[in-house]
């Protein structure tokens, strides 16, 4: 086996680095026969700087985050770490598509119409050779802030037309910042490895959906998603957007 040191970096929300490590370095190394495997992931812990920064922006929730509801107090910061092992050898789940974009709209606010997010999603679909209707579930970035949720759903509605099941698992993990990319994607991979995704409803008892958002496709009831192509999105500060598609290996 060939082992190679690739790179170490820090990007907002972690998803961009996870994607870049695979697509710009790790993937080509494997395809060229220069490496047998690539390990990619992220980690983050509670620290004063992000806590104070999000508080200064007015988006730090004092309670559990509630993405896509009419009462979105902001983000709840989580703590986490994860690694993924990608190999040339076939495994139960494969990374079939990825897309990334940088819309450069603002340092901390997403582009209101989600054009950059849409470009990343369409890029992932194109690379995977799939159509929007092939995707059985989308794990939204879904931070629970007003601007992020509105921008992301605008993009998803244009791509998927409300026909694809979607929700945000940050309701349960919080926003793990530098670990968010691997946390969000890892939940999907684990589900595919164990026969499907058992997903709770996006809105728990006492939570009211924000009906000003295009919520078609958002899970209002618990669902069992059969194995198939799934997507995870991460939309970071500075307009750094990524989308990953995983599917069972036939």
Model regions: which residues?
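Active-site-proximal gating segment of KS-fold condensing enzymes and close homologs
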Residues: 1-4, 9-10, 148-161
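Active-site-proximal alpha-helical scaffold in enzymes
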Residues: 1-41, 77-90, 176-197, 244
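Condensing-enzyme catalytic core mediating Claisen C-C bond formation in acyl metabolism
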Residues: 60, 64-128, 137
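Acyl-CoA/ACP chain-elongation machinery
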Residues: 36-56, 61-65, 72, 98-112, ...
